[in-house]
A protein has these predicted regions:
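Internal intein/HINT superfamily modules and their associated LAGLIDADG
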Residues: 1-306
Length: 306
C-alpha cells in the first residue's frame, strides 16, 4: 500500500473518484490505500461518505437523521428508562466530550439490547455498526450504536457520566436520580458492569458482583443497605469489587427487578433461574422472608454527594 506520508500522491485522485460517486471502500481498492486512511483524509477535507452508493440501501428511502430528537433524553432523569440507561452508560457507555458522541457497543448476542437503546434515543432508523475482533480465542462481533449530540453529552456530564470515567465516577446523588428511580439506575449499572453467578461445586448460592471505583461502590453498598461491607481489589488495579452473596444477593436482585420493564434479557433470565435454585433451600427461603428483609428494610440510604 502507498505510505500515508505520500498522501499528496493519491489524494487528488481520491477526490476525483469521490466526486464521481465512488464510496470510500471502492476508492481504497482502486488506489490500493487502506479504507480508514481514505476515509480520514477525505473527511478532513470536508467530504462525507457517499451513502447513496452503499450496497443494499434504497436511495429513495434515505433521509437525514434528526438527532435533535435525542437532545433532551437525559436533561431530567424522571423515568425508569432514563434512570436505567444512565446506569448502563455509567458502566458500559462511551462518551466523547471532544466530539460530542455517545456510543454503546455490546456483543452479538446482546444486539437486541443495543436496539432498545437506539429506540430509547428515538433514532430507530439509524443503522447499527458491527465491529469484528479476532483473538486467540476466536473471532467475536460487537454491535454498536452511536450518535452525536452536544446537548446530550452536556447533560450526561451534569449527571456524572463522562469520558474516561472508569477511575473517576461517583454514585449520583438524589438530586440527580430520585429514591423512587435509584434501583432502575442500579439495574442499568449491573447490566453493564455486573455479574450474577452461582457458587459452583453443587452450591445453589447466588453471588452478585459489581465493578467500580471505591467512591462509587461505597455509596452503592450503602444504598443497598450494606454500608460497612468490605470492597475487594480487582486485578491489582484501583478498580474495586462489591460482592454480595447468598440470600442477600437474592434480596438485592429482587429489589432491582421489582416493577422493572427494561433489563438485559440474558441477565434477567439467569437471575430467575438461579433464584429458583436458591429458594429450593428451605433455609434460604426462611432467611429471605424473615430476618434479611427486616434487617435491610429501614436502613439509612441517604446520598448527598454526586
Amino acid at each position: 500500500m502507498v505510505p500515508i506520508k505520500d498522501v499528496t500522491q493519491w489524494i487528488e485522485q481520491a477526490v476525483i473518484l469521490y466526486k464521481q460517486g465512488m464510496p470510500y471502500y471502492k476508492i481504497a481498492q482502486q488506489l490500493n490505500i487502506g479504507r480508514k486512511t481514505v476515509s480520514h483524509y477525505l473527511r478532513e477535507l470536508g467530504f462525507k461518505s457517499n451513502e447513496k452508493y452503499v450496497r443494499n440501501i434504497n436511495v429513495n428511502k434515505l433521509r437525514k437523521f434528526d438527532y435533535s430528537i435525542a437532545d433532551n433524553i437525559f436533561e431530567n432523569i424522571d423515568t425508569e428508562e432514563k434512570a436505567y440507561w444512565l446506569g448502563f452508560l455509567y458502566a458500559d457507555g462511551y462518551i466523547d466530550n471532544s466530539k460530542n458522541v455517545i456510543s454503546l457497543s455490546l456483543k452479538e448476542s446482546d444486539k437486541s439490547h443495543v436496539e432498545k437503546f437506539r429506540h430509547f434515543c428515538g433514532l430507530d432508523e439509524k443503522k447499527l455498526h458491527t465491529k469484528t475482533k479476532t483473538t486467540n480465542n476466536g473471532t467475536s462481533v460487537n454491535y454498536e450504536f452511536s450518535f452525536s449530540s452536544k446537548k446530550t453529552v452536556e447533560d450526561l456530564f451534569k449527571c456524572g457520566c463522562f469520558n474516561k470515567k472508569t477511575f473517576k465516577i461517583s454514585f449520583p446523588s438524589y438530586d440527580i436520580i430520585s429514591k423512587e428511580l435509584i434501583y432502575h439506575f442500579i439495574r442499568g449499572y449491573i447490566d453493564g458492569d455486573g455479574s450474577i453467578t452461582h457458587g459452583g461445586c453443587g452450591s445453589s448460592a447466588i453471588t452478585l458482583e459489581v465493578l467500580g471505583t471505591e467512591k462509587f461502590l461505597t455509596t452503592y453498598n450503602k444504598v443497598l443497605g450494606f454500608e460497612n461491607k468490605k470492597l475487594y481489589s480487582f486485578n491489582h488495579t484501583s478498580i474495586k469489587r462489591s460482592i454480595i452473596s447468598g440470600p442477600y444477593a437474592i434480596y438485592v436482585l429482587d429489589k432491582i427487578y421489582n416493577n422493572a420493564h427494561i433489563f438485559l434479557q440474558r441477565k434477567y433470565d439467569k437471575y430467575l433461574e438461579l433464584r429458583r435454585l436458591a429458594l429450593a433451600s428451605p433455609r434460604t427461603a426462611r432467611l429471605l422472608a424473615g430476618k434479611i428483609g427486616k434487617d435491610l428494610a429501614n436502613v439509612d440510604t441517604e446520598v448527598t454527594t454526586a
